[in-house]
Design a protein with these regions (language model features):
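RNA substrate-binding interface of SAM-dependent RNA methyltransferases
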Residues: 1-44
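Short loop/turn elements that form and flank the Walker-type P-loop nucleotide-binding site
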Residues: 27-29, 47-49, 69
Length: 110
């Protein structure tokens, strides 16, 4: 229970039609980001407003169609480049991105 503490307060969704979901979120004023190795470095994005985050599968990532529907694409730089490891697993990537969102929002409210 304690390891999933934030899950009780963080809206997480698995949807049948991601394209339609992205369109609806954008209509409601939500800025939709996806994570991809070809994106803008995470810290260069303003993550303080209402946002949704799209994470792809560990094998194939986010599809090109979904990337085109998103408002922005974020990239997580690897600390240990040249080690043969070129990406984080999806749960680690989510944790890093959520931490940056929280950090930016805390700094904005300080």
């Amino acid at each position: 229970k304690s390891s999933a503490g934030a899950a009780e307060r963080l809206p997480v969704a698995r949807v049948a039609n991601i394209g339609e979901t992205i369109r609806r979120l954008k209509e409601q004023g939500v800025f939709v980001y996806c994570a991809d190795m070809d994106g803008v470095p995470l810290r260069k994005n303003n993550l303080t407003g209402p946002i949704a985050l799209v994470l792809g599968s560990e094998g194939s990532g986010v599809s090109q169609l979904v990337k085109k529907l998103c408002d922005g694409v974020v990239r997580l730089d690897m600390a240990a480049q040249g080690t043969g490891v070129d990406s984080y697993n999806v749960s680690v990537a989510a944790g890093i991105i959520l931490y940056e969102i929280q950090s930016q929002r805390a700094a904005q409210n300080a």
